[in-house]
């Protein structure tokens, strides 16, 4: 701890980031890592045995192809086969008509690249077109490097083998021999979330970060999509299982902030918590066996009173409604998403994005050809790989690519100097490569925030030490050239994406926040009663809120990297946005607490009171895009004596008023805390 205290704050944050990423535990990560690790070793063995060139490309196919579950791996494998056909076909067309004419070759390759980049952003199968763009650029240096067309044709045909045999290998490993099923991962993930919920229910624990809660909720939704596509039983009972996922997400996220020491430990409350934990355990056992859980628990009047006293009545009712739901309830028909985005041919940003990528590639190709430096051809690949929809995400990808390339180059240098002279056979080579590939595979299976580092590290290492050589290599020039090529491509891309039609998210961020607050206002308009339809709607919108707040958080991180913006305006926008996100999360949890007390009131009274909060929030959200939003000041209406609300509910709603008043004032020149207290609220 003392050593960390002496380090600069950015270094400490970087170390904390890598610690979080490397220690991440999610269902399916270990099997995916092992599959990727074994696949890499088999690729090296096969390529060295049969002298197949482009080892780095084969490894890249594995790293992009092996996914967290068998269904996703099979789907990506099919896409890779289609992409390989398109890639090689486009290359042969380019070579046929322009082999000896670099200018004509670029004229033909340019529209292909632009079309692929355009479709990558607008089509559902963008991964296919991304692969075609990569190969179209990767094959441009071949005619300049080789004077014999026959050799170029052979190398191009080898690309078919290089792309397809790793695809076959990952299908055998990840789909046929050692499949990791999505349904198994879902059962494990649901039980892990319920374990965390029980721990917070029975013990006073520090709440987990809200970003982690939201990522876990999104992970469950992604697994649900794979289960629907991969498991027939899940599809048959999909309505129950989707309700189960929503219920578990709600219990997990709500109990994360629950503190049992905040309530009196009466015997009735203790017994009720034990009963609730017992029911959750029964749900866990049913999930582990793949069965739809049915509960015969009927809450008594004393248990209902204890649940209300310790703010657990809503969780209890939500759990019981799941236990009493018919497993054969017909699912809601799913709407098929369109293959293209709605504004594909009306939004100029997509075509500008393709033009920017082409411009960056042409600049790198001109420099590469002008200096006659074959080793830096990775600069053109870099321009395609780091091309992202906006400036912030492009900078993130550049940092990941540079970091991975740097680590890979260092490992390649150490490997060439210290290890390569002592190797005599393929077995020794595999033993030495095993820990490097294992490290790269573990990093590559982390979250999207850092996974590309592992892929780039292994590919850079292979390019420098294993590419097109089938014996010991001691050439340090390869290491230098690959790293410099990546640096040149990164610099050119940074300049182009920053100053040529920069796609900033600074204007989109307030709109994104307004959308999240709009969903929160919809939650407030749902009647706070234990009615089946209302509760299911509430749970589904709540999951959407987790996704919305997480998307806003990630957008804030990207906007922070947009250095073309004025520094003060950028800092003010980020500070205000983070305050809105933080207060929005707090308002959501505070509104949850009002459900327990509001259930005891007459239905006719609640919509009027809830409508005050929803109207104020919608008005605030409507002004975010134009920076005209002021901190809402809510005056709670007095109720007639015959409809007097519970003191607990009044106190909870006053707390919501206080949270509303802490929303930032976007009309002020600088972000200052609210000085006026919300009317009707107490400190």
Annotate the PLM regions.
Residues 61-62, 354-366, 376-387, 402-414, ...:
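Alpha-helical transmembrane segments of multi-pass membrane proteins
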């Amino acid at each position: 701890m003392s050593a960390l205290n002496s380090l600069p704050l950015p270094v400490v944050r970087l170390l904390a980031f890598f610690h979080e990423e490397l220690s991440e535990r999610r269902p399916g990560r270990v099997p995916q890592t092992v599959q990727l690790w074994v696949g890499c070793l088999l690729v090296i063995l096969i390529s060295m045995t049969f002298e197949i060139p482009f080892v780095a490309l084969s490894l890249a196919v594995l790293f992009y192809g092996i996914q967290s579950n068998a269904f996703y791996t099979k789907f990506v494998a099919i896409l890779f086969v289609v992409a390989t056909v398109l890639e090689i076909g486009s290359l042969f067309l380019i070579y046929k008509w322009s082999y000896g004419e670099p200018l004509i070759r670029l004229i033909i390759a340019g529209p292909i690249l632009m079309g692929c980049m355009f479709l990558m952003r607008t089509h559902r199968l963008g991964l296919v077109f991304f692969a075609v763009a990569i190969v179209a650029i990767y094959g441009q240096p071949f005619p300049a490097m080789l004077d014999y067309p026959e050799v170029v044709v052979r190398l191009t045909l080898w690309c078919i083998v290089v792309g397809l045999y790793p695809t076959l290998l990952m299908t055998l490993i990840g789909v046929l021999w050692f499949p990791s099923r999505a349904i198994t991962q879902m059962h494990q993930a649901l039980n892990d979330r319920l374990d965390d919920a029980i721990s917070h229910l029975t013990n006073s624990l520090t709440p987990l970060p809200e970003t982690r809660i939201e990522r876990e909720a999104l992970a469950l939704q992604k697994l649900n999509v794979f289960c629907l596509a991969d498991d027939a039983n899940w599809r048959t009972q999909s309505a129950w299982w989707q309700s189960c996922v929503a219920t578990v997400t709600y219990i997990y996220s709500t109990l994360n902030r629950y503190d049992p020491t905040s309530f009196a430990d009466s015997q009735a409350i203790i017994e009720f918590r034990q009963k609730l934990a017992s029911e959750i355990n029964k749900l866990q056992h049913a999930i582990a066996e793949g069965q739809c859980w049915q509960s015969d628990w009927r809450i008594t009047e004393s248990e209902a009173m204890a649940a209300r006293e310790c703010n657990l009545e809503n969780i209890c009712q939500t759990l019981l409604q799941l236990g009493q739901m018919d497993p054969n309830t017909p699912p809601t028909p799913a709407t098929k998403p369109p293959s293209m985005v709605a504004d594909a041919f009306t939004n100029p940003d997509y075509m500008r994005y393709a033009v920017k990528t082409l411009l960056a590639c042409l600049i790198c190709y001109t420099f590469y050809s002008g200096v006659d430096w074959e080793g830096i051809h990775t600069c053109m690949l870099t321009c395609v790989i780091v091309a992202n929809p906006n400036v912030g995400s492009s900078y993130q990808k550049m940092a990941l690519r540079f970091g991975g390339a740097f680590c890979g180059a260092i490992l390649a240098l150490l490997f060439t100097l210290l290890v390569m002279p002592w190797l005599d056979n393929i077995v020794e080579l595999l033993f030495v490569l095993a820990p490097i590939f294992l490290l790269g595979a573990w990093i590559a299976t982390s979250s999207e925030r850092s996974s590309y580092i592992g892929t780039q590290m292994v590919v850079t290492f292979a390019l420098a030490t294993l590419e097109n050589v089938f014996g010991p290599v001691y050439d340090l020039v390869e290491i230098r050239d690959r790293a410099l090529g990546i640096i040149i491509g990164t610099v050119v891309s940074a300049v182009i994406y920053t100053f040529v039609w920069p796609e900033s998210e600074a204007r989109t961020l307030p709109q994104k926040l307004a959308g999240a607050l709009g969903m929160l206002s919809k939650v407030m308009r749902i009647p706070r009663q234990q009615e089946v339809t209302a509760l299911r709607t509430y749970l589904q919108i709540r999951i959407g809120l987790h996704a919305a707040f997480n998307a806003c958080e990630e957008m804030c991180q990207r906007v922070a990297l947009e250095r073309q913006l004025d520094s003060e305006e950028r800092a003010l926008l980020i500070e205000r946005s983070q305050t809105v996100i933080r207060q929005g999360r707090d308002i959501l949890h505070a509104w949850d607490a009002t459900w327990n007390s509001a259930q005891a009131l007459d239905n006719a009274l609640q919509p009027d009171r809830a409508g005050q909060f929803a109207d104020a929030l919608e008005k605030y959200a409507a002004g975010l895009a134009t920076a005209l939003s002021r901190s809402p000041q809510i005056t709670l209406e007095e109720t007639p004596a015959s409809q007097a609300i519970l003191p607990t509910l009044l106190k909870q709603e006053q707390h919501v008023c206080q949270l509303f008043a802490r929303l930032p004032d976007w009309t002020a020149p600088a972000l200052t805390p609210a000085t006026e207290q919300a009317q009707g609220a107490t400190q």
